[in-house]
């Protein structure tokens, strides 16, 4: 369910604005998206795991807040580009 450090490093290098940029909203959205997709796969086998379902909803809300910040701060073009790169809908 968690992300390996190698996967996290590859996400950081892909979405970072500057070198060693781990805190930008772009990177955080990418990491949250990976965690959400891992949890979604987990629920295919464990349908009644309600505690993890709550954690998933919290992660989705956190990603939504980061995406709203990106849209407000960097504009609609950066927002749309990030959504396409991540492969999420909105």
From Swiss-Prot:
One of its GO terms (cellular component) is cytosolic small ribosomal subunit. Part of the 30S ribosomal subunit. Forms a bridge to the 50S subunit in the 70S ribosome, contacting the 23S rRNA. The keyword Cell inner membrane does not apply. InterPro entries: Ribosomal_uS15 (IPR000589), Ribosomal_uS15_bac-type (IPR005290), uS15_NS1_RNA-bd_sf (IPR009068). One of the primary rRNA binding proteins, it binds directly to 16S rRNA where it helps nucleate assembly of the platform of the 30S subunit by binding and bridging several RNA helices of the 16S rRNA. Forms an intersubunit bridge (bridge B4) with the 23S rRNA of the 50S subunit in the ribosome. This is Small ribosomal subunit protein uS15. Keywords: Ribonucleoprotein, Ribosomal protein, RNA-binding, rRNA-binding. SUPFAM superfamilies: S15/NS1 RNA-binding domain. GO terms for molecular function: rRNA binding; structural constituent of ribosome. The keyword Ribonucleoprotein applies. GO terms for biological process: translation. Pfam families: Ribosomal_S15 (PF00312). Belongs to the universal ribosomal protein uS15 family.
């Amino acid at each position: 369910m968690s992300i390996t450090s190698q996967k996290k490093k590859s996400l950081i290098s892909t979405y970072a604005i500057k070198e060693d940029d781990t805190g930008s909203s772009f990177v955080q959205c990418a990491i949250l998206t990976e965690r959400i997709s891992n949890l979604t796969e987990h629920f295919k086998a464990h349908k009644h795991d309600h505690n993890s379902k709550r954690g998933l909803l919290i992660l989705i809300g956190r990603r939504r807040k980061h995406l709203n910040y990106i849209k407000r701060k960097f504009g609609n073009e950066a927002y749309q580009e990030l959504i396409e790169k991540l492969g999420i809908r909105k």
